[in-house]
Amino acid sequence: MSEKLAYHANCWGPLGGHPVGVTSVKDLFYVTFGDMRRAFADIAAAGYQAVEVFDGNLLEHAGDIGQFRRLLSDHGLSLLSVYSGGNFIYPDILDDEFWRIEKAAALAAEAGAVHLVVGGGAKRAGGVRDGDYERLGAALDRVADVAAKHGLSAHYHPHLTTMAETPDEIRHVFAHTRIGFCPDTAHLAAAGGDPAALIEEHYDRVTYVHLKGWQRDPFAFTPIDRGDLDLRPTLEVLDARGFDGWIAVELDFWPDPLDGARASRAWLQQHSKVS
């Protein structure tokens, strides 16, 4: 199995959207409101090789991507992936959403990233309408085209609160798109799925994986060494398949982010062939 390990920098501050995005769809980038220098130092100290960041955190360095790359290299890290997203089902705003995704992809490529990950597929107040999955699928194909233009691999990240929560909903999405699949183990399990089984089912789309722990009651995301989600079957599937892509550990919040990163790294050392 892969020995390439990354960590998402989202744990080092609260998640929000760029404030300009309140009145401008094209500017609604994700942002971790935290100190990325500290995040990168901690991620390196915990033993990871690369990072994933939100598109808005990369946008902060749009005038000098070289500075961002130096910030990473100072800690012996590289940028692996950038995360973005969209509603993807409302034709009137789609071009503005893709202005943002195009910007994110261009900056990601300039910063040396390999992957572009997107979430989304809005759930309407009145529920999913006929044609919404087709619209989402077409938009995700467009994401894949944008990513390819910039030399990136594109992946869809099924997520709670979107049109792709349950295994059946995920199948419905993938019936309408050719984009890759970035499984997030916690989101898949929390929606009633079996992460290992879903990775096996859609393995031909999987070249990048998010590992995250999950606690059922009270609901919480956790380091992967605790909670109610046993990730050993997921690692077994990846190992049996000879997976050689990157694995990113993700954790949305933890009181001590460095402690959480170290705990997950130690668990991986104990339970997988990752060293």
Short names for language-model regions:
Residues 1-109, 141, 148, 152, ...:
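N-terminal pre-domain/capping segments
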Residues 4, 50-51, 141-228:
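Acidic/histidine-rich catalytic cores of soluble enzymes
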Residues 7-11, 53-55, 81-86, 118-120, ...:
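A cross-domain feature marking catalytic cores of carbohydrate-active enzymes
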Residues 31-32, 53-65, 87-97, 124-128, ...:
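Acidic-and-aromatic substrate-binding clefts and catalytic sites of carbohydrate-active enzymes
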Residues 45-48, 113, 206, 243-244:
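A structural motif
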Residues 64-68, 96-102, 129-140, 167-168, ...:
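Charged helix-capping and loop-helix junction motifs
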Residues 77, 113-114, 152, 241-245:
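A short helix->loop->beta-strand "cap" motif at the edges of active sites that frequently abuts
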Residues 108-129, 248:
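Active-site groove signature of glycoside hydrolases
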